[in-house]
Design a protein with these regions (language model features):
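Terminal, low-structured helical/coil segments at or just beyond the last alpha-helical repeat
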Residues: 85-126
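Short helix-capping/linker turns of helical repeat alpha-solenoids
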Residues: 5-9, 22-23, 29, 42-45, ...
């Protein structure tokens, strides 16, 4: 059942994000945040792949900043984005806003990577 599977990866991703932020019934826990997003990413869910890339990009969830790993996950996210089921109601604009709100003083490399990723998502037919 596609819908059930879809709900499942969506739920995993939401659980992972709640562990990252702490709240909505989840104690802040970086290992759990990464674990649930990794699982959903492996199942093809674009937003989970984006989240892991976002953690590497921002140096969050207990990960060292690593723009190469961020790019790898964001490329994966873009390749999974094609099917709207795989990114829920997320939009490139929404992700851009989120990236910016967590990264107030991005380096030149960060700005280039961010702009490349958002442009890539925008190029995918809705």
């Amino acid at each position: 059942n596609m819908a059930a599977e879809q709900d499942q990866v969506n739920a995993m991703t939401t659980i992972g994000w709640n562990y990252f932020l702490g709240g909505k019934g989840a104690e802040q826990n970086n290992e759990e945040a990464i674990y649930w997003n990794e699982r959903a990413s492996k199942l093809g869910f674009s937003i989970a792949s984006y989240n892991i890339g976002f953690f590497y990009y921002s140096g969050l969830a207990g990960l060292e900043q690593d723009l190469l790993k961020a790019k790898k996950y964001w490329l994966l996210s873009a390749s999974q984005w094609i099917d709207s089921l795989n990114h829920g109601d997320s939009t490139p604009e929404g992700l851009l806003e989120e990236i910016n709100s967590f990264n107030k003083n991005p380096s030149k490399e960060m700005i280039e990577l961010r702009d490349w990723f958002i442009k890539l998502l925008r190029s995918i037919p809705a």
